[in-house]
Amino acid sequence: SDLAVGAADTPSYAMLVEMKAKAKDKFIRGIRAGGGEEVFHVFMSPQGMAKLKLDSDYLANVRNAGVRGSKNELFAGSTSVLVDGMWIHEYSHVLTPAASADTGEGAWGVKGQRVLMCGAQALAMADLGKPSWDEKDFDYNNQKGISTSKIMGMLKPKFHSIIDSGVEDFGLIAVDTA
């Protein structure tokens, strides 16, 4: 959405719960985990993760749900935390869409970041066959040439939405925050 992002619009536990509910409303499937339950992967910048760790609801949930002592993810300095079926990852290369080149501030004077929630099929990969390896001699066997080839590719799927009647990313929700 193109709504204004204010300084108070920081990542929070409530935002994560709402993102997960929105994902289920949009029929975005989670990724099947070991026990058969669905999990989502959330990516945010180190600054976004720092702001999330300062959220009182997030702190209460991680503090009380996790193990006690130094193994608690909150105190162990973990960059990935599992909360309410969402793996939250700190990632340095998260898009800051409204940032200008000189200040890092968007159109509303707020330094922002984009939080991404990825479910199943947020990324598509095609892998066609085994790689090939070819060797050839040149210059009367004084030089060897080696060639490898592999056909593969990745893309972010986009589909026509029956809900919104538009083209949208598949398996992904993006939220801009301060």
Which role does the model predict for each range below?
Residues 2-25, 47-178:
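Sequence/fold signature of self-assembling virion shell proteins
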Residues 26-54:
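Structured, hydrophobic secondary-structure cores that serve as assembly/anchoring elements
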